């Protein structure tokens, strides 16, 4: 899909509507765990839409669409949002549907994203945690934890940035997988 010219006569909504007819969906979702900054959820939604994710799952509170719409570049209208009250409810949803759970977390069991191979035999959800406390232990113990390697001075990335990087890697591996299997 080629980007459009910088000077447009159509509204953003018209451009998105047109692009939606050509867009593809890949078998991945993002789960945001009780984000402390609502803007991070909006940016995560935008990345999920751009990469073709099936849905954004939210554990905890969800700000009103009127808040998310302008901050997500209006992309909230183009993705399915699922909301869960607790990590247990989320895990039950994934178990019932046989969804792979991959969590972005800095923990001893985590695998370097560069060494991780996504399983495309079933759908995947990528969990990114709260900005201050991370992914709940209940989810970590029922998922494959991964981490993003970096050599700079920072210790961790913003949760919306993390989800975008992992979505990009999922998208890359999925494209290679489809070339090999088709």
Q: What are these model-derived regions, one by one?
A:
Residues 1-182:
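Post-transcriptional modification and biogenesis factors for structured RNAs
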